[in-house]
Amino acid sequence: MTSAVPLLSRWCRATLAARKKLTHKAEPAFCKGIWWQCVRSLAALSNGPETGDMRGYLTSNYKEVKRSINEELVPSVSSSLLNPDAIFANNEMSLEDIEVYGFDYDYTLAFYSKDLHTLIFNTARDLLINEHRYPKEIRSYEYDPNFAIRGLHYDVHKALLMKIDSFHYIQLGTVYRGLNVVPDFYGKSSEGNTLKQFMDIFSLPEMTLLSCVNEYFLKNNIDYEPVHLYKDVKEAIRDVHVKGILYRAVEADIERYICYGERTQAVLSKLANLGKKMFLITNSPSSFVNKGMNFIVGKDWRDLFDVVIVQADKPNFFNDKRRPFRKVAERGILLWDKIHHLEKGQTYKQGNLFEFLKLTGWRGSKVLYFGDHIYSDLADLTLKHGWRTGAIIPELKSEIEIMNTSHYITTVTWLQGLTGLLERMQVYRDAESQMVLQDWIKERQEMRDLARKMFNRQFGSIFRTDHNPTYFLRRLSRFADIYMESLSCLLNYDLHHTFYPKRTPLQHELPVCSEQQNTGTFRIPLGKEMAQIK
């Protein structure tokens, strides 16, 4: 019997051609179930070679699968690319049901340039030297924006920075001590308080500073306590905020640090013109928010918001009933009046969500709140208060743009095909076959490393490990109904739009096309279609 792949490939083409004839549509890129079924069913149609030439038989199957993928599947996938400005849904949600829109400030209404992370890193590094007596030689380390990614975990006692998947397993090749990888470190992550996760965007300079100081101590054979280092770096990063260093620097050079202001203004104006209620709850101080919003929207920015709350101390704001609101007068003066109403055009400090709900009546699923921090901004609102939530993930756009490249598509489709070959051909246990399979395993690992490094050379994508979602994505899926790169993605949709989550097959389900393709519709807007929904 000869290779089963030509027969299988002809069956695939015939099946897809018949489907195209019936639906009058080309096969969408993400409807790949039939193709993966073809690849992964390869050996099932074969009884093995008649001649006993196992190497030739396996090589023939390998070449034919690779040819079919490169000539037929890759062009199909490349014809329908995702738009990085789309909104993606974890839960079904209709904007028609939303009456009230709430926002965080930092990295939600205000987006910052990379200069801000350099400022945080340099300032915290100097605080370590000047106030914690760390060696002045660490001043030679500069901030590297390409080192860390959001969502990493740090083992406080072992000084290890690592990437963990949704099943709490450490991804191989992503454990770093200092600035160097720790080889062959893999397995179930440790439990308890030893691991700390870095979830917000402001944590990127903190992770980099931790790694740089660890690197200095390791290179110079200096004995140190990792727990003390972690606490000192954490305190230095906190002081950059608490002591007002960051706020003063941004206010003094706002054009350098804040970007994309016109996009935020367009979203707020659209919602206001359609009669939606809006509020702002942020941990940032009043003067900082005021100067930023003056730059982004204009001096009348408060007219857009029904309620403005600063220095809210989230996530405590969502849980602590004891703290009352306090009105902020001009120049930041705090008034002692008891608050009976939250007035439009005024600014309030602290408070708590329970009093907020009582004074506004904005409860349940008619409220949609946007923030960038999955825990501090979104978790309690989803779990305890029933608000709908939207996560702002600035990294999303660049990751989708990478996934849309021909290099990534070719790499990942072949990785899937090679995995299918390995899965089916592992039944051949003779020495010659095992040599071929070991070569395939090595190539598969190379493909996985290549795909990972397209996003970040050290840690890969913030959304997935080699074959599982990351721990970060697991929490994002749990606490955010929708997620997007920025608020400006809302401009691509009218306010009657319903977001539907994409049906994905479970491990025990057939990889058939989801109902969205069977009905000829796309639930995730493609790049060439976005103009039609504006």
Swiss-Prot record:
Binds 1 Mg(2+) ion per subunit. The keyword Transit peptide does not apply. It comes from the Eukaryota. The keyword Hydrolase applies. Disulfide bonds: none annotated. Keywords: Hydrolase, Magnesium, Metal-binding. Its EC number is 3.1.3.-. InterPro entries: HAD-like_sf, HAD-SF_hydro_IG_5-nucl, HAD_sf, Pur_nucleotidase. Pfam families: 5_nucleotid. The active site is at D104 (nucleophile), D106 (proton donor). Belongs to the 5'(3')-deoxyribonucleotidase family. This is 5'-nucleotidase domain-containing protein 3. It comes from Xenopus tropicalis. The gene is nt5dc3.
